[in-house]
Curated annotation (Swiss-Prot):
<dbReference type="Pfam" id="PF07525">
    <property type="entry name" value="SOCS_box"/>
</dbReference>
<feature type="repeat" description="ANK 2">
    <location>
        <begin position="102"/>
        <end position="131"/>
    </location>
</feature>
<dbReference type="GO" id="GO:0045732">
    <property type="term" value="P:positive regulation of protein catabolic process"/>
</dbReference>
<dbReference type="InterPro" id="IPR036770">
    <property type="entry name" value="Ankyrin_rpt-contain_sf"/>
</dbReference>
<dbReference type="InterPro" id="IPR001496">
    <property type="entry name" value="SOCS_box"/>
</dbReference>
<feature type="repeat" description="ANK 3">
    <location>
        <begin position="135"/>
        <end position="164"/>
    </location>
</feature>
<feature type="repeat" description="ANK 4">
    <location>
        <begin position="167"/>
        <end position="196"/>
    </location>
</feature>
<dbReference type="GO" id="GO:0016567">
    <property type="term" value="P:protein ubiquitination"/>
</dbReference>
<feature type="repeat" description="ANK 6">
    <location>
        <begin position="232"/>
        <end position="261"/>
    </location>
</feature>
<dbReference type="GO" id="GO:0035556">
    <property type="term" value="P:intracellular signal transduction"/>
</dbReference>
<dbReference type="InterPro" id="IPR037328">
    <property type="entry name" value="ASB5_SOCS"/>
</dbReference>
<dbReference type="Pfam" id="PF12796">
    <property type="entry name" value="Ank_2"/>
</dbReference>
<feature type="domain" description="SOCS box">
    <location>
        <begin position="278"/>
        <end position="329"/>
    </location>
</feature>
<dbReference type="InterPro" id="IPR002110">
    <property type="entry name" value="Ankyrin_rpt"/>
</dbReference>
<feature type="repeat" description="ANK 5">
    <location>
        <begin position="200"/>
        <end position="229"/>
    </location>
</feature>
<feature type="repeat" description="ANK 1">
    <location>
        <begin position="69"/>
        <end position="98"/>
    </location>
</feature>
<comment type="function">
    <text>May be a substrate-recognition component of a SCF-like ECS (Elongin-Cullin-SOCS-box protein) E3 ubiquitin-protein ligase complex which mediates the ubiquitination and subsequent proteasomal degradation of target proteins. May play a role in the initiation of arteriogenesis.</text>
</comment>
Length: 329
């Protein structure tokens, strides 16, 4: 019999190994799904004791002790916005910071689904507001990705950090790329660095220009974002010209973008614009027309005031008309 086994082709033996692994995985998955459904059934029926027993035996959940789970009922309740089920599970001792294999917490799920009531319940139960997945994603990132202003505000109130390490996904960049200018405004009001530079993405302003998100570009510029900072040597004006977005090009020029700035290929914004396009004609016209003295004075005054103090312009002893002019209103 051993001789027969040895004479089998190697490929056939290998396929048998893979088939065995697949069978075990499917069996484990079936058991998990069955117990999750059973646990949910007991919760619905109000049998908390039985649901808690399943949780303790299957998920290893006990009060005050961490747990690892591929996908716990707490994750499901948070992702679907089922507040009553969420509270029931928490009262039965489910770990509020239970993580999946990718380190996703129930709070991540609640924010991704824009379920602010579930997010608040989890935070009140002690959820880690700055939990990070293996991809570097935080609950605040998920909230900004979905454009959830309520979750964004809630997380910041509970101590969420708008900026972690420089290479991790940034909520500011995510909001700017998706066009969620209201989330962006909330982040700015909490003091986020609007010029945060992530090497492979650039600044939020550059990302907004690449994504053609006019309202986000305007919000960032109003907040004092550096109009010249982009990605490496590419400026936001390079990005807007490349995307042929006339509105954004006009806005950047109004805020003092350098039309002669060169990227790593020694190309100016007009050089990366589509030939004979409206953007190319606009840039050539601006190049031949000097900025007005009023425009130059406004840029000079804003630079002198500095970004951290731009919000104090309304407190200056100046006529309202001049205050509005300095704030591009």
């Amino acid at each position: 019999m051993s001789m027969v086994e040895e004479n089998r082709p190697f490929a056939q033996q290998l396929s048998n190994v893979y088939f065995t692994i697949l069978s075990l995985f499917c069996f484990k998955l079936f058991v998990k799904i069955s117990l999750a459904i059973l646990s949910h059934f007991y919760i619905v029926k109000g049998n908390r004791k039985e649901a808690a027993r399943i949780a303790a035996e299957f998920y290893g959940v006990t009060q005050g002790r961490g747990s690892w789970a591929d996908r716990s009922p707490l994750h499901e309740a948070a992702s679907q916005g089922r507040l009553l089920a969420l509270r029931t599970l928490l009262s039965q001792g489910y770990n509020v910071n239970a993580v999946t294999i990718d380190h996703v917490t129930p709070l991540h799920e609640a924010c991704l689904g824009d379920h602010v009531a579930c997010a608040r319940t989890l935070l009140q139960a002690g959820a880690n507001v700055n939990a990070i997945t293996i991809d570097g994603v935080t609950p605040l990132f998920n909230a900004c990705s979905q454009g959830s202003t309520s979750c964004t505000e809630l997380l910041l109130e509970y101590g969420a950090k708008p900026q972690l390490e420089s290479c991790l996904p940034s909520p500011t960049h995510e909001a700017a790329s998706k066009g969620h200018h209201e989330c962006l405004e909330i982040l700015i009001s909490w003091g986020v660095d609007v010029d945060q530079d992530i090497p492979h993405l650039g600044t939020p302003l550059y990302v907004a220009c690449m994504s053609q998100q006019f309202h986000c570009v305007r919000k960032l510029l109003y907040a004092g974002a550096d109009v010249q900072k982009g990605k490496y040597w590419d400026t936001p004006l390079h990005a807007a010209a490349q995307q042929s977005c006339t509105e954004i090009v006009n806005l950047l020029l109004e805020f003092g973008a350098d039309i002669n700035a060169k990227n790593t290929d020694l190309l100016r914004p007009v050089d990366v614009a589509t030939s004979n396009s409206l953007v190319e004609r606009l840039l050539l016209q601006h190049e031949a027309t000097p900025s007005s003295l009023c425009q130059l004075c406004r840029l000079c005054i804003r630079n002198y005031i500095g970004r951290p103090r731009l919000h104090l312009i309304p407190q200056l002893q100046l006529p309202t008309l001049l205050q509005n002019f300095l704030q591009y209103r």
